[in-house]
Amino acid sequence: MDENQIILVDKPAGISSFGVVAKIRSQLKTEFGHKVKVGHTGTLDPFATGLLILLSGKMTKKSNEFLKLDKVYKAELKLGYTSTTGDIEGEISKYPNSGAFGGHDREAGRSARDDGPERPVPEWGILESTIGSFIGEIEQTPPKFSAIKINGQRAYKLARKGTDFEIPSRKVKIYDIKILDYHYPKLKIRCHVSSGTYIRTLAEDIGKKLGTGAYLTALRRIKIGDYNVKDAKKML
């Protein structure tokens, strides 16, 4: 087998993209009897699952070609709450006055109606128009808990230290968003986006515009360009 490969991996939850690279590198070393260079073409957060494209050997020189490709995700959002990281790994808080079912709010540890008059639960039409407003070229500010470099340091490392810093916004393109399922507070969507788009930020921005707040409870990448997760190998 050629050691210069395009390797499609279906990443499970709970492992970092760098952890996947290390595993594949180890497997190739066993297979070929020597170290083989392996690199990724765009990370997934540890809690996320789905398609990672790894390149080995001389193919690593083509990483920039893959970094530019569009991506398709399936995402699950929880409305009515926010997270310090935009996903399940952060500290979860109830969004002020967001629509709720009433009764005790287990996540926030208090009555869901303690914050004064509630905004109504978003109806389907409001949800559709709000989500539709994000289609096209938009300005997006990447999350502070991300791998973006700020003065040579990863943003997530600065955020963990409590360092105060700002990340400049940038233009990204949302080609399409489809609502797959909606039963408040849970929302499932399918997004086709340009390279560099953060789905965590998109989820938060949708929540802000709805007046409910939102964070990601699940994220799965199903396509990168023409490469599909259906053709990817499962992690051993």
Residue spans of the language-model regions?
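Catalytic/RNA-binding core of pseudouridine synthases
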Residues: M1-R106, R110, D114-L236
